[in-house]
Amino acid sequence: MAVVIGRTSEFFDFFVYGTASVLVFPNLLFPEIDRLTATLYSFALFSLAFLARPVGSVIFMEIGRKLGRGVKLTIALFLLGISTAAISFLPGYNQIGYAAVYLLAACRIGQGLALAGAWDGLASLLALSAPDEKRGWYAMMPQLGAPFGFLLASGLFAFFVSALSTADFLDWGWRYPFFVAFAVNVVALFARLRLVMTEQFSELLDQRELRPTSVFEMIRAEGGKVIIGAFAPLATFALFHLVTIFPLSWVTLFSTQSPGEFLVTEMVGASIMIVTVIASGAIADKIGRRTLLGIAAGLIAAFSFVAPLLLAGGVGGQTGFIMLGFGLLGLAFGQSSGAVASKFSGKYRYTGSALTSDLAWLVGAGFAPLVVLGLSSSFGIAAVGAYLLSGAACTLASLTFSRQLETVE
């Protein structure tokens, strides 16, 4: 339960900011330029957290080695909470000009550093400590934080967008989800500390050799595994933002649907994702994680050919895109973290898993909304399919070269 609560709080923060990147920051920070360009600038700020995450891993791994897991996690979650709460008080361009952009950039970098520091090894521990016949099931559990966090964030924004006038929403309504995010972080901090600081948890980490090591030492010893591991879930992470953040921007800019209505549609999609994340655990225990990731990548590749047609197909097509996209995402995302830890030797498993996750998010998801919106607005909606297809190809290539993911547990 602590794992799910902790991951839900992280993803709630993640999606609160992502949704605001579409509905709030283009108007708040760039009111004097056209909406499309303003959204692209907003997505550029969005990507800063992903650039900061590998740096955060280097910093917080050292803190963990020298001061302990509890201190590391406390600093990380306080930084995450402070960065998120500070955004809720952010003045706009009309108050302080482009200084508001720099303030938001600083907060976003703080979020990225903190998310890297919040890596506690719980997901890896679950996957490695589970019975052989249940490893896929246990690896799936932390991944439920993504759809739960999305449901909470989208529900809040859907309420405020629908209940308030545009002026009131842009003035003060958008700030409340960030206040809630801070409160959720406080609850998550104490829930995770109660687990992380127990002797039983420390003993389990030691038994599985999940201890922080120097990032640079790990890269020298097993850097190749980091590269392979970062590409293994690329199809998943490419799809991640193309069904959560990007469609909201596309609908807001180029469709007649209201943001509130579309957020409700995405919430239904997230509910489907919960089901398919759970299903991924059962399926992985039957056929193996490597096989499931390969099948999911193949399905995402097939989806890439119909995704542009659905997005261009009006309300019905866009609804179909969301339902199919979230369903596929759950199937792939459910095992994307469980596959990483098994690639590293015991000594480097903790640090290697953290850095691999950071790089996978950076390459696959960090720039996805920016790149796809920019390409789609210039060359057509087919760019969505091309981006998804490239991610699927990278995943299949990585799985071909990797031989350490088990085929059948």
Give the residues covered by each predicted segment:
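Glycine-rich segments within core transmembrane alpha-helices of 12-TM secondary carriers
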Residues: 137-161, 184, 356-368
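Multi-pass alpha-helical transporter architecture, strongest
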Residues: 188-195, 389-409
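Hydrophobic core of transmembrane alpha-helices in multi-pass small-molecule transporters
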Residues: 97-116, 317-331
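Helix-loop-helix hairpin linking two adjacent transmembrane segments in secondary transporters
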Residues: 146-192
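Extracytoplasmic gate region of multi-pass secondary transporters
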Residues: 18, 223-272, 365
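C-terminal ends and interior cores of transmembrane alpha-helices
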Residues: 78-96, 298-313
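Cytoplasmic membrane-interface "Motif A"-like loop-to-helix N-cap segments
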Residues: 66-78, 286-297
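Helix-to-loop junctions at the C-terminal end of transmembrane segments
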Residues: 55-69, 277-289
